Amino acid sequence: MTEKKTFAIGRRALLTAAAVLPFMGIAARASAAEKLGFGELYKSFGPLGLEFSDKVKQLSGQEVAISGFMAPPLKAEAAFFVLTEIPMSLCPFCSSDADWPDNIMVVYLSAKQTFVQFNAPIVARGVLEFGSWTDPETGFISQLRLRNAAFRTV
């Protein structure tokens, strides 16, 4: 009789694992952010300015991860920062999106995090948005953004 009980437990565990296994793959894919590099943000510069790459257009609304450096924040309690391709100790952006550099991205944090030094390499991860947008709270104009983002040092 104990053999039957052992068999029933083994069978139950096997059936549970078989039922859960497909969902584990979906969860792993959902949590794996697509990697994006600064060299992949734009495809050309023409009379109308920078043109977003096909990859940026395809990944819009999806979670991406991008490596870079945190520019010095405008204020210590800011809910966002500017991610740059190279370390910058000074403000890397202008007030107009017409002068938007091709190697920065605004990162809007989903939760407060302690900012890091400008020369510490980080990976930011969040939902990609593109197109000119003005932050109603700060007046900050951006062309590329990560929303609901977080970062970690690497």
Predicted segments with their positions:
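OB-fold and OB-like single-stranded nucleic-acid-recognition modules
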Residues: A30-V154
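N-terminal export signals
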Residues: T2-I9, A13-A32
